[in-house]
Amino acid sequence: MLIKINQYFRKSISVLGNLKLAIILLLMLALFSAFGTVIEQNQNVAFYENSYPNSAPLFGFLSANAILFLGLNNIYQTWWFTTLILLLAVSLFSCTLARQIPSLKMARLWQFYTKDQSLKKIGLSFNLQKTSLSKLAFTLKTDDYNVIQKGRFLYAYKGLPGKIGPIIVHASLIIILFGALLGNLSGFVSQELVPLGGVFHIQNIINSGTLSYVPQNFEGYVKDFKIAYNDEGSIDQFYSDLSILNSTGEEVRSKTIYVNEPLRYEGIVFYQTDWSITNLAINVDQQTNIQLPLKSINVKGEGKFWIASLPIANVEKATNDNILLVLEDLTGKILLYSSNQQLLAIVNVGENISLNGHSVKVTDIISSTGLQIKSDPGIPFVYIGFFLLMLSITLSYFSYSQVWAIKDNKTLYVSGRTNRAIYSFEQQITKMMNKLNSTYA
């Protein structure tokens, strides 16, 4: 029974470790990843129905129904994409067990040839008449070869790290795949729009894995938000002073974040991604304080604007006039328009203006910062995998070279081979043999 199980295991390892299977799996992952790049991910159903109408499928087959049925709207979290990653990892592991590790073990064995006819079949062969086996061994040792001499036979090798390289390549790829899979299953992405002075929890989740956990034992606090402008008046950078508070309200981490400079806390990364203006604080007749909500409008070719409507009583007409307040940025300049879109005035924050006999002053512009909050436990594994991959590339430059020799009467038969840089190896060995002949003549 155990023999049959062992045979089945070896056969399975042989099939899964097939190079063609690994290449097919890798190409499939690359193809579906390309689909994930082309097809917008994690959008609502209406988006796909509008972008990929069922009545007119793209390329004749890519419709909203097909995308949703196959999970192409969320490729990286589908069961079949996860299965492909697992199969590729198993294939690489099987190849390592079936081919790379046995190859390394063979490289460490002492492989003596006992007949000069066998040496001649290797390819690069020499017959030396004027030197001894011990002199050859000394010369090889000075060239960093590991030399084993047994009677009139000699075996030497160097460049064993070159045999370790392929194993590290497979190990690094498996670690990278594990990191990607871990991130898909247990990571999450949240987007929060938080007003200045606001406190927030992670709640607006836009993407999460089946095993993801969103911690609620801390909260964020936006202490300040500001925008830096360049000389042309366009936005150069925007900054948020962000604090992390524990369950007792104590600050445990703080940092001024900006684009490409996030805050990190317990494996969660807070990125600065956007900003907006949410409210205007207004004082009327030095008595009434109100907050007007702002609506953002994108005008093609002109940029983004924020608009609020302020109803002001018109005593003469016994009606309310709607005054439109328009902002382009956080510089404090506010444009006031009548309901029929006539420009009434341009004021700054803190400046009084008379509207229909009422004293109106904008006391503050309340801005919001846009944060992307991301957790990806697989990232450290991906970094480790890529580091090992770079290390394996370095190791691959080591040529694994072997030299055999047999002393038969007065003739020393020498042969050698290498797995790469063959021309350079042939030059080195030929030079070595010529030196032996001339030195010990």
From Swiss-Prot:
It is a multi-pass membrane protein. It comes from the Eukaryota. Disulfide bonds: none annotated. It holds the Pfam family ResB. The chain crosses the membrane at residues 19-39, 78-98, 164-184. It is found in: Plastid, Chloroplast thylakoid membrane. Keywords: Chloroplast, Cytochrome c-type biogenesis, Membrane, Plastid, Thylakoid, Transmembrane, Transmembrane helix. InterPro entries: Cyt_c_bgen_Ccs1/CcsB/ResB, ResB-like_domain. GO terms for biological process: cytochrome complex assembly. Its main location: plastid. GO terms for cellular component: chloroplast thylakoid membrane. Belongs to the Ccs1/CcsB family. Required during biogenesis of c-type cytochromes (cytochrome c6 and cytochrome f) at the step of heme attachment. PANTHER family: CYTOCHROME C BIOGENESIS PROTEIN CCS1, CHLOROPLASTIC. HAMAP family: CytC_Ccs1. May interact with CcsA. This is Cytochrome c biogenesis protein Ccs1. It comes from Rhodomonas salina (Cryptomonas salina). The gene is ccs1.
